[in-house]
Amino acid sequence: MTTSPVGRGRTARVRERLAGYGVGVAPIVVDASMAFFWFANESDVRQDARLLETQSMLVAPDLMAAETTNAWWKKLRRGEMDVTDVEEAVTNLLALEIAWVPSSTLLRPAARLAADLGHPIYDCIYLALALSHSAVLATADERLRRAAERVGVRLWSARG
């Protein structure tokens, strides 16, 4: 099975953007656990918002937008956000300068990582993306942080 021309084109554009972004500046792969806090109306946003101020290029699998929106939907169901808040959060997320990579292009290496680590495929998509671009991973998920350390993916820290 081959990658669709559309998927190939998006991936090529991301690679071109990454290549021209700057020597020595590692891109940062952002997962849903980080993006969630940016627009969730949380009182404890912590240092996660500092990620938006970085000079590094932000990269994410397209899966991240759906995962993040699902987390906001859970807050909606609990009465912690209203539908307008969720819609605004989605709009703000999609307006960010994030290079979106088709998740389908990461499934083979992610499946290998999932098998090797005994870790969910969803998280391994982020790991596969970080490994394929020598990127740093930004996540608030402790299990994913441990998996990243096991495969040699560097972790982002607000402390620099």
Language model: regions and residue ranges:
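Short loop/helix-cap segments at secondary-structure boundaries that form the rim of catalytic
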Residues: 145-150
